[in-house]
């Protein structure tokens, strides 16, 4: 028998509440924006994309730095989310290791069909966004046809383009 206030009753109650929240009726759509950033540019991109998503309406947004968030936290947020964006700089013509670790927690059975998109900053070649998109497709997510990739820091004009990208992503999610 579980005593009131016992940790296991709290866990069971919170899990049940979460299950009900996830499965019952209309709820706010949720977007998870994950990124890793070498010089802060990809973080700035994530923030600009979030601004565009916010402008589309009633969508909850969670932004997580893959390098600092635990994989358990990221997976928990992914389970609650209807869509995911993944960002990375291009270093040595590739995305970063942290992004590959993120791919390991995306479950094609559980997450199949979730809307997804890739974004990233680069200095020279810019392959990261394409690599991310290809991996998201392989994991059975519904990847937008466009990625957002910009050279170095996204200045004001680029941030406006990123917000528009986020808005298009949100509208596709809501459609």
Report residues per predicted region.
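Single conserved hydrophobic/aromatic residue that forms the stacking wall/gate
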Residues: 1-11
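Short, highly selective alpha-helical patches that border small-molecule cofactor pockets
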Residues: 42-46, 50, 99, 129
């Amino acid at each position: 028998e579980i005593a009131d206030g016992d940790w296991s009753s709290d866990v069971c109650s919170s899990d049940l509440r979460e299950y009900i929240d996830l499965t019952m009726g209309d709820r706010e759509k949720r977007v998870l924006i994950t990124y890793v950033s070498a010089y802060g540019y990809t973080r700035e991109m994530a923030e600009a994309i979030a601004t565009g998503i916010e402008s589309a309406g009633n969508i909850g947004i969670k932004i997580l730095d893959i390098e600092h968030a635990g994989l358990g936290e990221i997976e928990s947020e992914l389970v609650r989310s209807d869509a995911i964006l993944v960002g990375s700089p291009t270093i040595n013509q590739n995305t970063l290791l942290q992004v590959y670790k993120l791919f390991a927690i995306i479950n094609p059975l559980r997450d199949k069909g979730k809307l997804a998109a890739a974004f990233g900053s680069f200095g020279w070649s810019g392959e990261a966004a394409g690599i991310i998109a290809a991996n998201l497709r392989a994991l059975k997510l519904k990847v937008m046809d466009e990625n957002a990739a910009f050279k170095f820091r996204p200045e004001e004009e680029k941030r406006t383009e990123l917000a528009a990208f986020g808005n298009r992503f949100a509208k596709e999610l809501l459609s």
